[in-house]
Regions:
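C-terminal accessory module of base-excision DNA glycosylases/AP lyases that mediates lesion recognition
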Residues: 1-118
């Protein structure tokens, strides 16, 4: 509905991010995440894109849809290994933080290794 009202595709970063903010507000008020479908797209931004490339889940940047598909594959693997189902908004939260630290440290591999050890 938000996407239609704004005339944007539902996978647009602004639309997905607004859903994420709504989800976080709901978490603060109700102490639980909203039940979004697993196929909700990840909001692709600079950090999410660069972690996808740096991690090797995409060979090279050919568009945001490739990045979304790669993170969807990661989500499928995560959900096959844990007892609880998560969606890409949960993965985005972690990926974005990793990407931010990588950027602050000029993508130094030592910074990424340090984060992974935390």
């Amino acid at each position: 509905d938000v996407a239609k009202a704004l005339g944007n595709p539902s996978k647009a970063k602004t639309i997905v991010f607004s859903m994420k903010v709504f989800d976080l507000a709901h978490l603060i008020l109700k102490d639980e995440y909203l039940n979004f479908p697993e196929d909700i797209p990840i909001p692709v931004d600079y950090h999410v894109r660069n972690v996808a490339i740096s991690s090797g889940i995409v060979d090279k940047y050919a568009g945001d849809d490739d990045v979304r598909r790669a993170w969807m594959s990661v989500l499928s693997e995560v959900n096959s290994r844990i007892s609880r189902r998560v969606n890409l908004l949960r993965i985005d939260s972690v990926v974005w933080q990793v990407g931010k630290v990588m950027y602050k440290n000029n993508f130094a591999i030592r910074s990424l290794i340090f984060i992974c050890l935390l």
